[in-house]
Amino acid sequence: MKTIDANTIINREKLSPLQWMVFILGFFVFFCDGLDTGIIGFIAPALLDDWGITKPQLAPVLSAALVGMSIGAIISGPLSDKFGRKGVIVFTSLLFSIFTILCGFANSTQDLMIYRFITGVGLGAAMPNISTIVSEYMPVKRKAFLTGLAGCGFMLGISCGGVLSAYLLESYGWAKVIIIGGSIPLILVVALLLKLPESTQYLITRHQQDKAQRILEDIQGHSFQEPVKLVLTQAENASDENPVKVVLGKYLWGSSMLWLCCFTSLLVFYLLTSWMPTILKTAGFSTQQFSLIAAIFPFGGVIGATIMGWYMDKLNPTTVIKYSYLIAFALFIVAGLVSSNIFLLGLTIFLIGALLAGAQSSLLPLAAMFYPAVCRAVGVSWMHGIGRIGAILGAFFGSLIFTFNLSLSGIFFILALPTFISFIALSLKVIYEKSKNKQVLKLEESL
């Protein structure tokens, strides 16, 4: 019986139709996740007017989904590593689709808060798991680029929510806009059931050789000529280890820095996506102006994540992302200085999106590359879940902005600080990894 490393087939230069299918499905899961995540922020000004509620009264509604996302991400990782990626992705995609539609029929802030919480559980569970499975199917030389490119669907989804709101909100109302946003993922769920394969790395670690073999034969385009035993590299094949113990053991320092980075990054990201339309409206911008400027932010993230993914495959991926946060920090200062000029503000918001939102999108493929298969879903999901706690705080801090009557310039100056902390966290991760590598080299030289 011939022994074959499954990754040698996946890592071929040319992607197979099955790998492209995983990429496309991953992109659309990210797109729908972004659409249903961001759409509540775009309809928030209309919701305030329609229901006659105050901004602090709306804050729990905006935060409910973020609480759900944190819970969904944290609990889905162990479930995915135990029961498989596909089932978790399909179920959670269906969950956030149905409850986003129900949001359009809510009659009170309490109903809307409950629906958004359950929506958030689905959104939070789907994203890290689809990122994991896309990463596992992409060849190593283009893993960061293609995984990051699929992740751009999230930013495009948020932008699409802004465009829908800009052209439909005033004519059709907030309820129809959010129902449209929830209906699109229902089509995707059918495609996921029919076309998304299970992770071959998961199947091999769970000793399901026959299923993994059929998928790998599909990727290479022909059957194996003799009986084979599929294996993974030594780092990937520690299937008997407890994934939680692996994350909290030898990967603890790197995990801690990823958690801190994701926490502060998502705090800023979700404060902007949840409250930017309302902040800009309060500053005097029209509905079309604030919707389009707010949509520019995640669209910049699409450009940024694409470029970063390419560089992450060529250079140290952590270093690429950390400098993106540093430049984003400087751009927040610039945004505060040019906030009175709509053209310069829009341009700066686009660049912040390219660097901050692009870096945030790139954290998922970075984490997927950092962890081995045995704990990859747990590691990625926990980073995402802990980061969502920052998102929750971001949504609440957004409501406090109006309490303190901060100027638009003051808001941008404040947002620069957590962005700088993200840079520091990744810098510490790089320093630790370099120190650890030097220790390994010294040990090898002494033997």
Task: Identify the meaning behind each predicted range.
Residues 1-35:
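Cytosolic juxtamembrane N-terminal segment immediately preceding the first transmembrane helix
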Residues 1-12, 195-251, 437-447:
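Intracellular cytosolic loops and amphipathic helices of Major Facilitator Superfamily
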Residues 21-55, 272-277:
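Extracytoplasmic
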Residues 40-41, 248-305:
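Extracytoplasmic gate region of multi-pass secondary transporters
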Residues 52, 84, 105-111, 122, ...:
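Helix-breaking motifs and short loop linkers at transmembrane-helix boundaries and internal kinks
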Residues 71-109:
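Conserved MFS/SLC helix-loop-helix module at the cytosolic interface between two early adjacent transmembrane helices
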Residues 95, 99, 110-118, 343-351:
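Paired small-residue
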Residues 142-170, 184-185, 384-394:
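Glycine-rich segments within core transmembrane alpha-helices of 12-TM secondary carriers
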